């Protein structure tokens, strides 16, 4: 299991300051919508200047018609990131088109599909998708697996089931990890590190418990000890 640190601070400068404090740790860095829209490709380059060995997960959750998603995926290749994601609800045709397009490249990033956002509760999710989170997450994961993707974004509660219906090597990345029982904020389906580990999660994403800490490096050290 690997740790991915969410770079969700209000400014580029604050994110870079955080990265500087944790530069000696073997962790992934997650660049989300706000940070990428605000700071762009230059931010990705600045990360590599601090530590060229950092691996970057570009969390943009692509969702569009198949050709547009595939075009965007090709553009992401040029950014040199190590992982990005799409929405599974865009459908199998869109996901397949993304993977077919990426076959042109000798080296491509890991591609994950978002199943159910961890901010959803059962009631909200059911009104939109007409089914339970667990059933729909399994279906989305199966669609992603059959479309040739490398894994999915899901909560820790769906990870074991998804691996059972796909493959043990099919990756799961879980946001909403609260390693020391912190407030869950706007996340609904949260878990701790031990639960994620027992669910055979491949990547855990931790944000607020790290960047809100006075000593983020120490928090990372403690999380890595649990991993």
From Swiss-Prot:
Official protein name in the record: Orotidine 5'-phosphate decarboxylase
Purpose: Catalyzes the decarboxylation of orotidine 5'-monophosphate (OMP) to uridine 5'-monophosphate (UMP).
Pathway where it operates: Pyrimidine metabolism; UMP biosynthesis via de novo pathway; UMP from orotate: step 2/2
Matching InterPro entries: Aldolase_TIM, OMPdecase, OMPdecase_AS, OMPdecase_bac, OMPdeCOase_dom, RibuloseP-bd_barrel
NCBIfam families named among the record's database cross-references: PRK00230.1, pyrF
Domain of life: Bacteria
Residues holding substrate: 8, 30, 59-68, 118, 178, 187, 207-208
HAMAP family, A to Z: OMPdecase_type1_B (MF_01200_B)
Entry's Gene Ontology molecular function annotations: orotidine-5'-phosphate decarboxylase activity
Source organism per UniProt: Sulfurimonas denitrificans (strain ATCC 33889 / DSM 1251)
Subunit-level organization: Homodimer.
Family note: Belongs to the OMP decarboxylase family. Type 1 subfamily.
Keywords, sorted A to Z: Decarboxylase, Lyase, Pyrimidine biosynthesis
Record bears the keyword Lyase: yes
EC number of the protein: 4.1.1.23
Gene Ontology biological-process entries: 'de novo' pyrimidine nucleobase biosynthetic process; 'de novo' UMP biosynthetic process
PANTHER family named among the record's database cross-references: OROTIDINE 5'-PHOSPHATE DECARBOXYLASE
